[in-house]
Structures are given as C-alpha cells and as structure tokens.
Amino acid sequence: MITKPNKNAGRKKRHAHVRRTLSGTPQRPRLNVFRSSKHIYAQLIDDVNGVTLAQASTLDKELGLENGGNKEAARKVGELVGKRAVDAGFESVVFDRGGYLYHGRIAELADGAREAGLKF
C-alpha cells in the first residue's frame, strides 16, 4: 500500500530537532514563526521564563490586510514584529523558522524584521 507522507508531521519533527538546541533568553529572545495557508504569525519568546514578549500576525487590525497568505503580508508582519521588538528594547534575536524552509513567506518575514532593526 502506498501512503503519501504528511508534510506537517515532517515539519514538526524538524522543528523538534532544532528546538533541542535553540532557545531564547531574556536578552536574546527567539523569533518564532508559524505559517498557515491563510495567515502567518510571529512572536518573540523568552524560553527561560516562558513568556511571549511581542507578537504580530496577519490578523492584526493595525495592518489592515485583505489577504494574509502572500509574501507582501509576511513582509509587513515581519516589519511590525520587528518594530514592536525594538520598541520593547530588543535588537538581537534568535530566528526560529519553525521547521519551514527558509524560502518564500518565511524569508520575506525575516527580511521585514531585519529592515525594522532586528539582528539575526
């Protein structure tokens, strides 16, 4: 019997493998990314204290997006989370791509965050 491999299960396995070594600190939090077919979410996480320090997504009313599943929306989310992080006093983060390939919407979000002043 031929079965189709589950892409999301593979992504979760890759993410778990990376998360064993990757961790955010209060001085250098983790910029976590989650992508769905319609939206993209980004948040700064302090893993030591288990606290979310800043977040942004395509669902934010501040962005006023009609379509949240494209590269332009991902770049705007990256710029917004970067702006919120810089306003909160963070300039350096650890980028956690969530097991996704660094391509397309993930790369655009990262570029937007870099433009806003984050370093990673």
From Swiss-Prot:
Residues 1-29 are annotated as: Disordered. Residues 9-20 have a biased composition (Basic residues). GO terms for cellular component: cytosolic large ribosomal subunit. Keywords: Ribonucleoprotein, Ribosomal protein, RNA-binding, rRNA-binding. One of its GO terms (molecular function) is 5S rRNA binding. Belongs to the universal ribosomal protein uL18 family. Part of the 50S ribosomal subunit; part of the 5S rRNA/L5/L18/L25 subcomplex. Contacts the 5S and 23S rRNAs. This is Large ribosomal subunit protein uL18. It comes from Shouchella clausii (strain KSM-K16) (Alkalihalobacillus clausii).
